[in-house]
Amino acid sequence: MKIIHFLATMAISSLLGACNGGQYIVNRDPVDYVNPYIGNISHLLVPTFPTIQLPNSMLRVYPERADYTTELLNGLPIIVTNHRERSAFNLSPYQGTNLNPIIAYNYDNEHLTPDSYEVELDDNRMKAEYALSHRSALYRITFEADKPVYIIINSRNGSIHVGENFISGHQQLSDNTNVNVYIEP
């Protein structure tokens, strides 16, 4: 009788063990466990924003909007100098004829990680992808193919210089600090 119970237990254990064989372990990096949306809505304090920044790096970016729950992005930031205010430089991709220094976009399918940002802009007519390293960053912007394309770079309190294969600029912050940018298309 003990042998039958032992064999039945072994058979059931083997059957249950075989059921788990279809699952596989996904190798995840530590960055996959970070949720940049934690702590973004506060009813008592000023809200913070989901931030894209590597530890101890010079660049910090977050989607520029009035608050976390708004439906519009106010352009795409190039660099943010603190955790709750506007960016030092602003980039606005555009297709159309109404050019403004900063363009408000409706957006969808936003995806943030600590080192990248991806969003579809203006009713999915444009897609912006942003990746950063410690001292530089890369924007990739995909447009509709059949319309003229414009990219507007804005410096609120500074200047922009357009060269043959580069764009450079500086902006004066409120505490007499200069922020410089060098962009290659």
Language-model features and meaning:
Residues G17-A18:
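C-terminal motif of bacterial Sec signal peptides marking the signal peptidase cleavage site
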Residues Y24-P185:
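Accessory carbohydrate-recognition regions in carbohydrate-active enzymes
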Residues K2-T9, S13:
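Sec-dependent signal peptide recognition
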